[in-house]
């Protein structure tokens, strides 16, 4: 999920991506506007399209103006408001013909075939549900950014899976083997103007032990995290407007300049395409990830 858009400020005017000489670099190939605080993108390989969550006017308000759009791999919007009636949907994941999205204090299940909401799973006591990832065993994990925790949907019930200071500002989620990779926003308890940047951790799904994924030095106000296709991860630094890459055990390296408000990215490896919502400018960009 994005670091709350209203606390980030205006986006930069352009997008310039420059990587280190020995690193892969990303190049913008398309840019699509017309969204309403887009927060996350999810690729549906079977349908050949992206789902784009739109938070609407207020990312914390239960105001019913949130929705999900669909978009092609070329950046063209297919359906502006495919699913409506949401509040402020953020991260998404697909499992068993359903699209799951985090919507403030509940996980919403959408039937992909019909485009209708098919279930809602409240997370009583959660503060701000954020990103979502579906595990092969059927469990669905959800980060709670301001609750410093990860929740799990299992047997139709939401419960806290892990809560720990090492999950400070738990945001983006990804899977690597038996570990949940968590990109931490950082400590925003004193307000966003005094935020202490976070770093990436690994949460063992069996023991629930939490360790640093690589360097524990602050990497940024982290948002989305995705496998990079070469054994590491790609990360967005929301406030810094940066695209980062990190290998297990290593430090996060800047591989591209984005805009402040860069949110929950998606990487489609077989297309070499990174897609990033730029929340404040109501824009989604597609980037070619050179190999």
Locations of the language-model features?
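Sec/Tat signal peptide C-region and signal peptidase I cleavage site
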Residues: 19-23
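Glycine/small-residue-rich hydrophobic helix-like segments
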Residues: 195-254
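Beta-rich, blade/repeat-based domains predominating
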Residues: 35-47, 58, 64-65, 83-100, ...
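Beta-propeller domains
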Residues: 52-76
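A short loop-to-beta-strand structural motif that recurs across blades of beta-propeller domains
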Residues: 60, 64-69, 106-108, 149-152, ...
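Short loop/turn segments that connect beta-strands within beta-propeller blades
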Residues: 71-75, 111-116, 153-157, 204-208, ...
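Bacterial N-terminal signal peptides that target proteins for export
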Residues: 1-10
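A short beta-strand motif characteristic of beta-propeller blades
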Residues: 26-32, 76-83, 116-122, 157-163, ...
């Amino acid at each position: 999920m994005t670091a709350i858009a209203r606390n980030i400020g205006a986006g930069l005017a352009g997008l310039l991506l420059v990587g280190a000489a020995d690193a892969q670099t990303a190049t913008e190939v398309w840019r699509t506007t017309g969204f309403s605080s887009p927060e996350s993108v999810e690729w549906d390989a079977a349908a050949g399209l992206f789902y784009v969550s739109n938070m609407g006017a207020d990312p914390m308000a239960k105001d019913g103006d949130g929705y999900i759009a669909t978009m092609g791999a070329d950046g063209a919007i297919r359906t502006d408001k495919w699913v409506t009636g949401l509040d402020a949907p953020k991260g998404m994941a697909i499992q068993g013909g359903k699209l799951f999205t985090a919507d403030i204090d509940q996980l919403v299940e959408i039937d992909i075939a019909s485009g209708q909401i098919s279930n809602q799973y409240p997370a009583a006591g959660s503060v701000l549900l954020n990103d979502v990832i579906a595990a092969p065993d059927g469990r669905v994990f959800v980060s709670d950014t301001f609750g410093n925790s990860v929740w799990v949907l299992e047997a139709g019930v939401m419960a806290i899976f892990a809560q720990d200071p090492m999950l400070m500002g738990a945001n983006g989620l990804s899977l690597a083997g038996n570990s949940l990779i968590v990109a931490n926003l950082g400590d925003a308890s004193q307000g966003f103007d005094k935020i202490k940047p976070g770093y990436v951790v690994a949460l063992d799904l069996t023991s629930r032990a939490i360790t640093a994924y690589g360097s524990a030095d602050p990497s940024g106000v982290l948002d989305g995290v995705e496998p990079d296709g070469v054994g590491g991860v790609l990360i967005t630094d929301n406030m810094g407007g940066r695209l980062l890459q990190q290998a297990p055990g290593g430090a996060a390296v800047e591989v591209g300049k984005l805009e402040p408000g860069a949110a929950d990215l998606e990487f489609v490896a077989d297309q070499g395409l990174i897609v990033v919502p730029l929340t404040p400018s109501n824009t989604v960009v597609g980037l070619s990830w050179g190999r």
